[in-house]
């Protein structure tokens, strides 16, 4: 068809048309070239080119036949508005320049093209086509320009494929359906295969493949903005993208580099859409990085894989904010100890790291650190971490280890799913973490931790499955699901903490005022596994269920040796809510216990010396409901005589089986408590607001309870409510009358 068209053109030219006609060569729907037929001496065709010979010119305009979509004629005036640079292998590039008299000067020597533009027209369009293994484009422009890349393939073994100076914003439009490629050479004196000193904008839906042999794939002292297109850095000796700022709203970026994938210098990064994939294998590199500035991610899909030591997937010195997006990061690089002071300073592989704050409002994060990433961190901030929404999953298998710190002291590090040097606040969203390495931490803060608000209810599922490891002497690094130097406040949420060692620990205090909270701290090591541990523990609301292999509740300053009765003035206070505890001891305070409201439901061990409730100071029951069953340890004491609510301390010589019940009622048959213990027990602490002075009560072991449920919805054991007790099959163990004056009533049977 095209051959017939060319014959037809030749016939028309040979006859010399009476009317003035213009011939137009089209490319990709555009008018690429036009000339009056009256000045065309001839059009010839060889293997590669259509050769246009104009009157008075000794040379021909050679246009590759493959880039001419069609030739048409018109009697209308044709205004060409686009510049074409067509690379022809080792032949001179074809230049079609309708602005040659308006300040645009273009020269070509083989595939080396130089453009100097002083034109006063914004965004002149340069269409780049063809192939050259020895080509380049160098341009100086005083105004922004647009480059349409239409199956452009340039390799420059001695410099950048494209180098633009002038500090202007330039747009690279990747023509739909095209595949373009740029490659530089090792002898280049520039930093990028595509290099500019101004902002770069990518548009279009075509593909651009880049090889950065010398250094970076794309390098600019301005911003890189990806609005669309598929950009693939196949390889880079250093960074894939190296810029001062990065923006992305659509398109696809795929980077394999020796250095960082995207290095935005000290300027901001904003990602609202598109897809980013990066594969990095070197040590101490970053997937997405800015220096002193911020990173904001509100959309898009990001997949980052880093295998080098101490690498970071997303890294900034400023704030990192997530308002959307789907982020996946996989890291496997080891920790690195750098000599400093009198020892070493460790650095770890980290999925998200900032020297400032991290704010997560929305989005999905899936962060994985392999077992080779010892000491690795999922999310780490030198300042605060605030999670208001989104779905976060961190899987961390890195082990901990000992090292000599910069002060010359033996120290240790361990992996952590989420860690901050200041405060952690989780007010919404879903957070799931698994830390399986030795000494691994789930949530860790050197400041305070707040979970939930009055209206914000997050979902937490925090798990540690690793073992403790010895640091020195009797000092171990313990796995902990939630640990803070400052106060921990649980206000709301559906929160589950599962640990093979410690559950919740604060050096200051733990306060629970709401939420549904489950803590399981189960260790195979004797004496290990604290459920909730802090000097001050306050429960004022919510539903909390604690199961521990050692102490369920441990109020301590850590200054009192085990087995002693010294009061360190620590506190366990219950003023509201429901707390259900099973442990060995269930409740242990090296100081005082005060109950003024709510429910305390506890089961201790069967065998002494551990107890259901162990305290060194006072145990005041001034309100609320208390039911606790434990061993017959000689150390077990009744509540303090300063209690203001009547209570019972019941000491049975016979064991109550965990399959049985203890039931207490008044002479009218009104139920005071019906309790099924988790373990076989002997001694009980009982108090409810309905318990009265100078009143006769009956105590039964056994019997049956129909209907109803356990307070707090516990499973298998607890305080019954809402059903009916029957003495059938039960044994009346004691009938007695409470004191007319004292609130503490001790009975043995």
Segments (PLM) and residue ranges:
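A composition-driven surface/loop motif
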Residues: 77-749
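Short polybasic amphipathic segments
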Residues: 21-26, 50-54, 660-665, 697
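Bacterial Sec-dependent N-terminal signal peptides
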Residues: 1-22
């Amino acid at each position: 068809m095209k051959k017939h068209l060319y014959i037809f053109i030749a016939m028309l030219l040979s006859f010399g048309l009476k009317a003035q006609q213009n011939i137009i060569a089209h490319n990709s729907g555009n008018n690429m070239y036009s000339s009056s037929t009256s000045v065309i001496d001839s059009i010839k065709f060889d293997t590669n080119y259509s050769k246009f010979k104009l009157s008075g010119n000794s040379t021909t305009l050679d246009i590759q036949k493959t880039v001419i979509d069609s030739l048409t004629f018109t009697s209308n005036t044709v205004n060409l508005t686009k510049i074409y640079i067509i690379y022809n292998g080792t032949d001179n590039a074809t230049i079609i320049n309708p602005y040659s008299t308006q300040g645009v000067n273009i020269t070509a020597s083989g595939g080396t093209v130089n453009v100097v533009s002083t034109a006063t027209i914004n965004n002149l369009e340069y269409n780049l086509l063809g192939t050259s293994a020895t080509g380049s484009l160098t341009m100086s422009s005083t105004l922004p320009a647009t480059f349409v890349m239409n199956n452009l393939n340039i390799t420059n073994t001695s410099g950048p494929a494209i180098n633009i100076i002038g500090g202007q914003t330039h747009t690279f439009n990747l023509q739909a359906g095209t595949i373009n490629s740029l490659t530089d050479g090792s002898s280049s004196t520039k930093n990028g295969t595509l290099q500019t000193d101004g902002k770069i904008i990518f548009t279009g839906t075509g593909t651009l493949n880049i090889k950065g042999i010398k250094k970076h794939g794309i390098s600019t002292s301005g911003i890189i903005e990806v609005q669309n297109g598929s950009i693939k850095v196949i390889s880079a000796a250093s960074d894939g993208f190296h810029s001062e700022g990065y923006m992305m709203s659509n398109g696809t970026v795929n980077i394999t580099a020796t250095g960082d994938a995207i290095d935005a210098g000290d300027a901001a990064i904003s990602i609202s859409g598109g897809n980013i994939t990066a594969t990095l294998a070197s040590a101490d590199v970053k997937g997405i990085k800015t220096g002193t500035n911020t990173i904001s991610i509100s959309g898009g899909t990001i997949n980052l894989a880093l295998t080098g030591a101490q690498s970071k997937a997303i890294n900034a010195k400023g704030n990192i904010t997530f308002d959307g997006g789907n982020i996946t990061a996989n890291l496997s690089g080891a920790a690195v100890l750098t000599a400093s002071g009198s020892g070493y300073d460790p650095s770890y592989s980290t999925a998200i790291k900032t020297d400032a704050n991290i704010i997560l409002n929305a989005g999905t994060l899936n962060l994985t650190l392999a077992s080779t990433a010892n000491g690795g961190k999922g999310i780490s901030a030198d300042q605060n971490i605030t999670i208001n929404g989104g779905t976060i999953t961190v899987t961390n298998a890195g082990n901990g280890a000992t090292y000599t710190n910069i002060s010359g002291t033996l120290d240790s590090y361990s992996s952590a799913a989420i860690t901050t040097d200041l405060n952690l606040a989780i007010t919404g969203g879903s957070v799931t973490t698994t830390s399986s390495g030795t000494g691994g931490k789930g949530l860790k803060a050197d400041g305070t931790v707040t979970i939930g608000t009055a209206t914000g209810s997050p979902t937490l599922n925090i798990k540690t499955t690793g073992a403790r490891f010895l640091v020195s002497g009797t000092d171990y690094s313990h796995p902990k699901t939630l640990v803070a130097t400052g106060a921990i406040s649980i206000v709301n949420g559906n929160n589950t903490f599962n640990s093979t060692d410690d559950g919740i620990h604060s050096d200051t205090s733990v306060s629970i005022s709401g939420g549904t909270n489950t803590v399981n701290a189960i260790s195979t090591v004797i004496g290990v596994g604290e459920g909730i541990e802090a000097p001050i523990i306050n429960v004022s609301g919510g539903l909390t269920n604690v199961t521990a292999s050692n102490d369920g509740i441990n109020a301590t300053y850590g200054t009192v040796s085990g087995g002693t009765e010294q009061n360190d003035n620590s506190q366990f206070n219950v003023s509201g809510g429901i707390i259900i505890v099973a442990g060995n001891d269930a409740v242990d305070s090296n100081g005082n216990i005060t109950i003024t409201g709510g429910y305390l439901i506890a089961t201790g061990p069967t065998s002494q010396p551990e107890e259901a409730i162990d305290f060194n100071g006072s145990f005041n029951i001034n309100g609320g409901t208390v039911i606790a069953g434990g061993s017959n340890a000689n150390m077990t004491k009744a509540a303090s005589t300063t209690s203001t609510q009547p209570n019972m301390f019941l000491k049975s010589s016979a064991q109550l089986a965990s399959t049985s019940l203890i039931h207490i009622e008044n002479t009218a048959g009104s139920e005071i408590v019906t309790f099924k213990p988790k373990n076989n027990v002997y001694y009980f602490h009982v108090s409810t607001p309905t318990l009265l002075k100078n009143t006769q009560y009956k105590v039964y072991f056994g019997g049956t309870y129909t209907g109803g449920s356990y307070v707090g919805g516990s499973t298998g054991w607890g305080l019954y409510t809402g059903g009916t007790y029957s003495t059938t099959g039960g044994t009346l163990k004691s009938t007695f009358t409470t004191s007319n004056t004292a609130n503490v009533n001790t009975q043995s049977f």
